[in-house]
Design a protein with these regions (language model features):
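Short, intrinsically disordered, charge-balanced linker/junction segments flanking boundaries
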Residues: 353-361
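RNA-binding accessory domains that recognize and position tRNA/RNA substrates
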Residues: 2-3, 8-255
Length: 373
């Protein structure tokens, strides 16, 4: 990630208190507007190495250098800019299963954060000259200004099948001529789940986004403390339509949240890494548990939901390859109805009684019979 700030992309001076003022955020695409003299992708021969010994050859684009992380894939046909700027992908090398990446370029105002969070991008083909009237640059240029490498020309179908069959795997890619260096890096890699990834993406200080927010009848909206475990901009925007939102770092303890901000409810966001990690994720988990003890309403999305499960005494576990993309089938366990959903998570809450969570969630993933959250 690049372009971080104490409030991770929030611009306080651009917000006027009141119900009709949406928060303003620094978009990851803004760096392209300030950049000049960017070079086209060099097409340097590249090499992708997996920890199981599998290797793929391709061509490099984006930032020069070596990328390393946990290899995962996402199945969306579009929305690549939102995926690349989603903090939940921190620590990972992101593969796009759709064969063409970047056909409409990079658009202003649609990023989910101020930076690019995957440590590397893998695709079949990257569009060199995007075709959209609002585009401010190509995917290559976008990754280059954010310091993130990419590799194209990879058989992503074979790569995806490998991950589906055997699970996520550590990987490294970079210039083919540096293969010996990459092998050495790969041999010493540890899973990113061991890192405090939440600490790397959370904001550094609490800020009130929409002070004085009101509903359509002029009544004050309830105040929500949103714990930032890697929250996406669009979640903040949607919350601000319904609440007066305090954007809080994951490390901020519950007593401080209550004494300084006096919220009516607590929310825990999406984010990267293992929910049982002892770092900032544990701090957020403790705040959720304290809120429950105080009989305060709580809610969680993605990692936030997993933290709620841990706070309630349940356990979480890592999915074999995760659920990432816009076409994830989910079945309602009460009615049998199947919906196609957008998901992005690599962990789930364990259902020890094979039915205890059904009354709470009503849903289970139809693709591999695992919980959808």
């Amino acid at each position: 990630m690049s372009g971080a700030s104490p409030t991770r992309g929030f611009v306080p001076g651009d917000v006027v208190p009141g119900a009709q003022n949406a928060p303003a955020f620094t978009d990851a695409a803004d760096l392209l507007l300030d950049s000049t003299g960017l070079q086209q992708a060099s097409g340097t021969p590249g090499l992708l190495l997996l920890a199981d010994g599998t290797r793929y050859e391709g061509k490099l684009f984006g930032s020069e250098g070596i990328a390393q992380g946990e290899l995962v894939f996402t199945t969306g046909m579009c929305g690549y800019q939102e995926s690349m700027t989603d903090p939940s992908f921190a620590g990972q090398v992101l593969t796009f299963t759709w064969p063409l990446l970047g056909n409409y370029g990079i658009l202003p105002g649609i990023s989910e954060s101020a930076g690019v969070h995957p440590r590397g991008i893998v695709c079949r083909q990257v569009m060199k000259i995007p075709d959209h009237r609002d585009s401010v640059g190509s995917v290559h240029e976008f990754l280059a200004v954010h310091g993130v490498p990419g590799i194209e020309g990879i058989d992503t179908r074979a790569l995806t099948r490998r991950v589906r069959e055997h699970g996520t795997v550590l990987c490294v890619f970079g210039p083919k001529e540096r293969s010996d260096e990459m092998k050495e890096i790969l041999s010493g890699m540890t899973p990113p789940d061991a890192e405090d990834l939440v600490a790397s993406v959370t904001c550094e200080e609490a800020v009130l986004l929409n002070q004085g927010a009101q509903d359509d009848e002029g009544e004050p909206l309830p105040r929500l403390a949103a714990i930032d475990c890697g929250i996406k901009y669009n979640i903040l925007r949607e919350l601000c339509k319904r609440f007066e939102v305090v954007w809080c770092p994951a490390s901020l303890d519950f007593d401080s949240i209550i004494s300084e901000w006096h919220p009516d409810a607590l929310f825990a966001s999406n984010g990267p890494g293992a929910p049982a990690h002892p770092g900032d994720a544990a701090s957020a988990r403790e705040s959720l548990a304290a809120a429950v003890r105080a009989e305060m309403p709580v809610m969680g999305i993605c990692l936030g939901h997993q933290l709620m499960g841990l706070a309630a005494g349940l356990r979480t576990y890592k999915l074999r390859y995760g659920h990432r993309g816009a076409n994830q089938p989910v079945v309602d366990l009460q009615t049998g109805r199947v919906d196609i959903t957008s998901q992005n998570h690599g962990f789930a809450v364990e259902d020890p009684d094979k039915g205890m969570l059904a009354c709470l969630l009503y849903t289970s993933d139809a693709a591999d019979d695992t919980p959808c959250v």
